Amino acid sequence: MLYYMSNFTLSDSFLLKIFSNKNSRLFEEAGNHVLKENSGSKDQVGIIYNDYNADPKMVDAWQKETKGMSVYYVAPRSKTLRMDAKVLFAKKMKESQYVPKTYFGYDEIPTDTPDNALFFVKKNGSTGSRGVDIHAYSAMKDLDYTERVVQQNMNVPDLYDDKRYKIRAYVVLHDKNVFLFNKSFATVASEDYKEAVGDMDQEALRKMHVIFQTSGTKFILSEELDKFELVQQNMLVACKDFKNVYRDEIKRIEANEYAILGFDFVVDSEGGVQIIEINHRSNYAHPKVMENKVDVPLLK
């Protein structure tokens, strides 16, 4: 879906200037909310969200155009690449208890692993479900592991309406700090969950376990989950662990920079969580309810 870049100014004594080249409609909607809430303020603020890196010439031009304007812009991709890239993320977080058991080749997997144990094999650089396969251990010996990450499937996942789900939570990095946004949503698998017994073909496994966005994907607000309060607490703890592991990278996020990270969590039957991947340039194309309840409040 194509979104045209937009550059617009909102003012009611409080001055807010916004540039976005990704779903600018949501940024404008969030900006109007901010404008109403800060009516009468004399602050002058600029926000730049670029899917690549902010143009320093734009920052300079805004500050020259409006003396005293505070301009905040998305952190350069180089500062968050080790969070976003699948192989780099896996290597960095491998020892954390808040990610799946992680391997980079068949020979690393313990030999006493049950034949029907499932593993996700993810190709570096893939987006969404593209480049993600799921295999039983018995079928993995001859796979290609070049530039791939192997994550072991959790044994007993939590279910929604008898199906697996994946939570998308937003984490904001700003001025060396980490913030977990308190609203999130989940996407639900297309097929009911069944334990892997005997041979199951790749397509059947994908429909149960590889959860991705299509025109027919079911979205729910995370607060609809039975264990939501516990899951929310555990996501916060996982984010604290992330902050510790990535402390050097987070220290590089300056006072005038921010990053909005999309954390994908899976949840077990006890409400425990695992971060399966992080996206440092999220896609905000979601159903209207998710936009109104999660995306716009986040951007605001």
Residue spans for each PLM region:
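A residue-level signal for conserved active-site and pocket-lining positions in enzyme catalytic cores
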Residues: 89, 93, 169, 278
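A short acidic/small-residue loop/turn micro-motif
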Residues: 281-283
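Hydrophobic residue at the +6 position relative to the catalytic HRD Asp in the kinase catalytic loop
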Residues: 263-265
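Conserved N-proximal alpha/beta basic substrate-recognition cap immediately N-terminal to
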Residues: 3-118, 125-127
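Catalytic core of tubulin tyrosine ligase-like
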Residues: 116, 124-259, 268-273, 279, ...
